[in-house]
């Protein structure tokens, strides 16, 4: 009799995921835009946005997924994320000064723990990241080629200190700043968009492939216009490494392709540098790295920061001087201002601020997350692990962005800049969540590999 009863179709409240993802990404990409064009985005409003996003996620998972909080499984990578949060709390001398950063970090860790229970949320948050980034790409191109509009309508909205820096960057150095208050921040937006655009190319369907290639080239062009040489070099490096791992074929053939792409890019950038001042500026900054001019500091003062960080580490090698204390102490070595300065090398700053103990925990997170992601990508490339098209795109984005983040840690401050660390935690959550969703299949693959290797011996 039951088979004749029409059961009501289960309603999914996917809109909750979309709203939550939008708010989370809006919170990192556009909070500063709100303060410039709409209203002052205080810490309270930031927390309210995040709190509402988390509440929506909890409502979705507890209703649609029937998830009980006390039954949530925590994966090894997620434990490491929690430990890094504890390192911040334990080593912070003044919790009030770092409260906003720590709360945002904690919220992201909690979301990573939750989101593995619905793979669709991976896809939604990825497309929100891509869409938010493209807003900045469009603004970057528009304002670069229409400087009069930028100076008349966007530039006046910044405060006097920001305007002084922006005037020099836009009018003298020809950097594309877009909607950001510094060309460095805009370069980060471009790099994140570049990693996302690159991942789209790996969809099995070749539909709209020309549009996807064009999108990648447009975003790359916008990144070059920002003049951020480190971000440009590391993002291209991340794409090439991801290409080698995720593209089928012989390694030698892939290496030849990579070398061809690099040489072609160099020639195109060189040719365009004669016609576009922003590209000329970027090209000059890159070639300056290989200059033999002894009076030129190619590090832009980074070597001095490295020496200061190392000396602080030697003063307290086990526990460090305290989370974000380097930024406060280093101003004693500079006379011009009291602006917070990071070491422009995350690894050195971690040693300096959290000591060997905290450094070891962060490095464990970095290494375990990238190893897990590479292994997943390799299995997917060999068709051992069956992933949907959208999930594979998310995985490749996770790989590409993690490589970029870790490489940029050498000369930048991605762990301390909200835009970069936000997306990094999400990227780690992507790979950890994909592993969780397919763990039985992965364990079966690993057993087959082990048995096969024993048989060969």
What are these regions (language model features)?
Residues 17-27, 211-217, 345, 374-411, ...:
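Loop-to-helix entry and N-terminal half of a specific, functionally important transmembrane alpha helix
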Residues 57, 85-86, 126-160, 164-172, ...:
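Alpha-helical transmembrane segments of multi-pass inner-membrane proteins
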Residues 54-57, 236, 240, 394-457:
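Transmembrane alpha-helices of multi-pass inner-membrane enzymes
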Residues 78-82, 95-117, 123-133:
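Aromatic-anchored transmembrane helix interface
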Residues 1-65, 84-91, 405-407, 426:
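N-terminal signal-anchor transmembrane segment
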Residues 29, 290-354:
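Long extracytoplasmic/lumenal interhelical loops at the membrane interface
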């Amino acid at each position: 009799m039951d088979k004749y009863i029409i059961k009501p179709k289960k309603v999914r409240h996917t809109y909750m995921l979309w709203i939550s993802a939008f708010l989370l990404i809006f919170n990192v990409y556009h909070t500063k835009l709100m303060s410039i064009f709409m209203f002052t985005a205080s810490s309270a409003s930031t927390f309210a946005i995040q709190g509402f996003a988390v509440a929506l996620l909890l409502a979705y998972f507890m209703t649609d997924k029937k998830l009980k909080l006390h039954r949530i499984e925590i994966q090894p990578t997620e434990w490491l994320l929690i430990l890094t949060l504890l390192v911040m709390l334990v080593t912070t001398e003044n919790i009030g000064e770092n409260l906003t950063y720590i709360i945002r970090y904690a919220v992201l860790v909690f979301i990573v723990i939750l989101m593995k229970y619905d793979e669709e949320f991976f896809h939604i948050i990825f497309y929100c990241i891509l869409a938010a980034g493209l807003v900045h790409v469009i603004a970057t191109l528009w304002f670069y080629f229409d400087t009069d509009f930028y100076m008349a309508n966007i530039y006046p909205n910044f405060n006097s200190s920001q305007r002084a820096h922006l005037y020099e960057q836009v009018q003298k150095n020809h950097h594309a700043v877009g909607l950001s208050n510094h060309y460095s921040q805009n370069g980060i937006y471009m790099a994140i968009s570049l990693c996302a655009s690159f991942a789209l190319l790996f969809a099995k369907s070749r539909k709209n492939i020309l549009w996807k290639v064009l999108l990648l080239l447009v975003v790359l062009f916008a990144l070059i216009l920002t003049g951020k040489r480190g971000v440009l070099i590391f993002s291209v490096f991340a794409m090439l490494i991801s290409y080698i791992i995720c593209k089928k074929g012989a390694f030698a053939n892939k290496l030849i392709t990579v070398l061809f792409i690099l040489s072609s890019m160099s020639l195109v950038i060189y040719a365009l540098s004669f016609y576009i001042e922003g590209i000329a500026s970027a090209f000059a900054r890159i070639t300056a790295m290989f200059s033999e001019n002894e009076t030129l500091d190619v590090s832009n003062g980074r070597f001095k920061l490295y020496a200061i960080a190392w000396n602080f580490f030697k003063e307290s090698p086990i526990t460090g001087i305290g989370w974000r204390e380097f930024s406060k102490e280093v101003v004693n070595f500079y006379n011009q201002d009291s602006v917070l300065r990071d070491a422009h090398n995350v690894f050195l700053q971690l040693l300096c601020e959290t000591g060997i103990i905290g450094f070891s925990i962060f490095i464990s997170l970095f290494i375990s997350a990238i190893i897990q992601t590479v292994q997943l990508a390799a299995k997917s490339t060999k068709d051992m692990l069956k992933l949907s098209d959208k999930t594979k795109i998310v995985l490749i984005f996770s790989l590409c962005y993690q490589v970029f983040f870790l490489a940029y840690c050498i000369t930048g401050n991605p762990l301390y800049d909200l835009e970069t660390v936000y997306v990094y935690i999400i990227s780690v959550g992507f790979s950890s969540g994909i592993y969780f969703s397919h763990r039985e299949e992965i364990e079966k693959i690993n057993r087959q590999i082990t048995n096969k290797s024993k048989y060969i011996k």
